[in-house]
């Protein structure tokens, strides 16, 4: 069992971002931080060495608007497991309808199709990560289409930050229930977009971001076996990335959220039973 702590924060003054700004149409997006064309979700950072925007956290991703029939991305996948993503087109809500699986690219950027075969016209696509931060990440260098990119759609006026563990990340939500199942935490059985965080945000018409992963504690840790907890590493872009070791820059909190939800208890309690 666990407990959720909820805290409201002072949000941004702007009720929306994107959507209402007229911008020149472009054929390719090579700067994913350009808010005129791209909405980013979650804690993401640009990797200077590999020259790509890093998407590592559950439910992180991007959203854009274009005129055409298909969109592709030049990306590099890193990690020990497949990286699985959901694509939503024109307001779709089923996270299992369009699923992408990216396998290891050996450090090389390759062109991957995100969506194709759409009717020729204006579309909005959102691409979000299903899998957790400790097993995979992708870096995106550029996004292209067979048409033109237009101004990014409006983002929700409310953004919620969730801090938690496997339950928050939706790990194992797609498995058949078994009391003991070694396969319950695989890329195929995980979907952060079907976690309580996703459903809560949907009910509130909010965007959301997740910081955490399966097995992580909020505070307690054994320094001999556990490098991080949420509390001792929340200044990072992901719970298992070290700012001190140069894994990523320190997180920039200038982008405020409207509420913070902290999932308390489960792993901290289990560790307390193991260690005095």
Model-inferred region functions:
Residues 11-163, 167-192:
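N-terminal secretory targeting modules
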Residues 5-8:
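C-terminal motif of bacterial Sec signal peptides marking the signal peptidase cleavage site
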């Amino acid at each position: 069992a666990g407990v959720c702590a909820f805290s409201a924060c002072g949000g941004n003054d702007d009720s929306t971002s994107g959507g209402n700004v007229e911008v020149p149409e472009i054929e390719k997006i090579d700067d994913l931080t350009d808010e005129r064309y791209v909405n980013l979700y979650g804690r993401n950072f640009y990797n200077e060495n590999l020259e790509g925007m890093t998407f590592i956290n559950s439910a992180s991703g991007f959203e854009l608007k274009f005129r055409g029939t298909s969109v592709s991305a030049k990306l590099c996948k890193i990690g020990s497991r497949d990286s699985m993503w959901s694509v939503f087109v024109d307001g779709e809500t089923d996270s299992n309808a369009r699923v992408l699986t990216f396998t290891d690219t050996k450090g090389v950027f390759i062109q991957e199709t995100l969506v194709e075969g759409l009717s020729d016209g204006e579309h909005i696509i959102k691409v979000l990560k299903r899998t957790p931060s400790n097993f995979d990440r992708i870096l995106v260098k550029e996004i292209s289409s067979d048409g033109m990119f237009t101004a990014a759609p409006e983002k929700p006026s409310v953004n919620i930050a969730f801090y938690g563990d496997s339950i928050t990340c939706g790990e194992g939500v797609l498995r058949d229930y078994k009391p003991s199942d070694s396969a319950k935490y695989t890329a195929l059985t995980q979907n952060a977009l079907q976690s309580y965080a996703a459903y809560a945000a949907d009910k509130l018409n909010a965007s959301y971001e997740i910081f955490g992963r399966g097995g992580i504690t909020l505070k307690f840790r054994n320094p001999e076996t556990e490098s991080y907890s949420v509390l001792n590493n929340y200044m990072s872009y992901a719970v298992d990335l070290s700012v001190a070791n140069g894994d990523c820059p320190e997180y920039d909190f200038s982008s405020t959220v409207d509420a913070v939800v902290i999932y308390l208890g489960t792993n901290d309690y289990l560790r307390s039973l193991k260690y005095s």
